[in-house]
Amino acid sequence: MENKGNMELSNSYGFYKNGRRVSFVKATSEQSLDEATFIEKGSAQAFYHSLFENDRDNSHTMNSKRDEAGFACEVCQIYIPNSKKINHFKSMTHLLSSQHISNKFQPHLLKPKSLGYRVLSQYGWSPQGDTAGLGLENQGRRAPVRAFRVKNDTIGLGTKIDLEKVAVNKCRKGKRQCQIQHSKDVRLKEALIKHFSSN
């Protein structure tokens, strides 16, 4: 039998054709998160703080020792230096911790003359976004519906249109063709009158 070193040769191609197979070594043992405590606490803020509780306590002591001016964020309940104030308000930690992010109505590009705009205004919709949406609990539509296709024909809903007939009607005839068609119609009319009057 071959020795163990030859058995570990891989059947790969290219640069590592005759190289030994590299065995995977875990860096550290896996640590499972306690999901029961996360579900009981029920908020992203509590879960985030439970992950970094020791770091947070250390940062409080370090910041208290420093004379750097800052403030305590009421939403996240952590101390923030003034130099990192804007970055903190944009951070995911602060956004997840905030109970309510105001969702103001964004200005729209529809004109007040549009049909959807007028219909919603008649039912109590405010274009400034002061009021909530339509409906009993104000959870309905807050923006007018844009009409992408206006129905200008007189054909009812659900009817099928014969596209060949529409194409024939839409093609415009020239002056000469109209004269020829008119003379054919006159001759046909005279022939019909002559036929029925002779009987």
Curated annotation (Swiss-Prot):
GO molecular function, one term: RNA binding
GO cellular component terms, A-Z: cell division site; cytosol; mitotic spindle; mitotic spindle pole body; nucleus
UniProt cross-references to InterPro entries, sorted A to Z: G_patch_dom (IPR000467), GPANK1 (IPR039146)
Segments forming domain G-patch: 112-160
Stated name of the protein: Uncharacterized protein C1604.16c
Source organism: Schizosaccharomyces pombe (strain 972 / ATCC 24843)
